[in-house]
From Swiss-Prot:
The keyword Transmembrane helix applies. Pfam families: Phage_Coat_B (PF05356). The lineage of its organism: Viruses, Monodnaviria, Loebvirae, Hofneiviricota, Faserviricetes. Residues 1-18 are periplasmic. Its main location: virion. One of its GO terms (cellular component) is host cell plasma membrane. InterPro entries: G8P (IPR008020). Homomultimerizes. There are several thousand copies of this protein in the phage capsid. The keyword Transmembrane applies. Gene3D superfamilies: ATP synthase delta/epsilon subunit, C-terminal domain. It is a single-pass membrane protein. This is Capsid protein G8P. Self assembles to form a helical capsid wrapping up the viral genomic DNA. The capsid displays a filamentous structure with a length of 760-1950 nm and a width of 6-8 nm. The virion assembly and budding take place at the host inner membrane. Residues 40-44 are cytoplasmic.
Amino acid sequence: MQSVITDVTGQLTAVQADITTIGGAIIVLAAVVLGIRWIKAQFF
């Protein structure tokens, strides 16, 4: 039973790291899109 709990804890830690990475990528992508829209608004 202890090894199952350890395995689940390890998997949750890995998933949490993946979620953090994906969240950061989404924020960066949104910032880039907003920057491009702002630059376009300056010229048009």
